Amino acid sequence: SLLLSYQTILAHYIHGKPSSWKSLEKPKFICPVPGFDRHFRIFDDFDIEVITVPLIEDGVDLAKLKNVLDENQNVMGIICVPRHSNPSGEVYTDENINGIFSIGKAYSDKFLFLFDHAYLIHDFLPTKKQTPTWQLALNNDTNNQTVIVTSFSKVTFGGGGLSFLAADGDNLDLIKKTRLSMVICPDKINQQRHVDLFKNKEAIESHMTKHANLIRPKFETSYEILGSISDDYGTFSKPTGGYFITYKTSKPIASKVIELCSMLGVSLTPAGATFPNSNDPNNNIIRIAPTFIDEDELKIAMDVFITSVQVAHLGPVSYTHLTLPTNVAV
């Protein structure tokens, strides 16, 4: 889905109608934050300015989105992860997606709505229902402005799954035009492998249930350990699917926490990575990936993390008030 997202932006940059984006003065694109670092890199490659809008519980902050569009010219579109958003896990409501469509459409009938549905079927706990995004696009008469991408990269093998794209009108024509110059044909053997394994919807759902059973305990362990220290130190997201947790420190100490963890042998996503140019303006967002290691290692890593949060929060003072796990010493 990342490659299809890139090719969608490339298509508009080179062949966009009525004007290619490369011919415009200071084109811009909106990214909700905290967000996916690879999305930011796409726009860096094309020297497209990224404008951020905050995420709230139900999706994008619509008031901030409208303000951004009211104050800026040549905003070409918005990219969203509408289900289990990376890294904080928001699941957009239908009302929020409808609002995004309404505000963007009012700004321009060429405004691009790019949805990266990387975690479309990746629930591991009960998750709110969503109307299919393409149906919402049809309902809002924005199907000619909408591109939805997803893949099986996190279903079968990373980088080795099948990818899918939904688009219409000029968007579909532009993407096809660009891809036809790049790709002779898809990997048909890989397609056949997937068809042989996933013969129907039920087979896919059964497979994802197995994924959920592997992943859920790791998240529950993480929630328990993160919840063992006071909210005075920070708060954390509790996603019902996807692959990440976001920890928000109450002080601007994210970089210090990550440094302390690294000193103790725990590697985390670099500070600032969930913002454009790796610049977290408040230095307080940390992305946690519980799925990477086994559960025993995860418990140790999370103990290191909460200890590092407390040490960084308290600074050079006595640590008598720390909530310390038994296997971590300061």
Task: Locate the predicted segments by residue.
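Conserved core of the PLP fold type I
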Residues: 1-109, 121-141, 252-254, 306, ...
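Hydrophobic "anchor" residues on beta-strands that sit immediately upstream
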Residues: 77, 112, 147
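Conserved Walker B
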Residues: 117-118
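Conserved core segment of the aminotransferase class I/II
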Residues: 137-216
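Conserved glycine-rich beta-strand-loop-beta hairpin in the small C-terminal domain of fold type I
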Residues: 209-223, 233-248
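Conserved PLP-binding active-site segment of the aspartate aminotransferase-like
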Residues: 246-251, 268-302, 308
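Conserved small/polar residues in nucleotide/adenosyl-binding loops
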Residues: 320-326
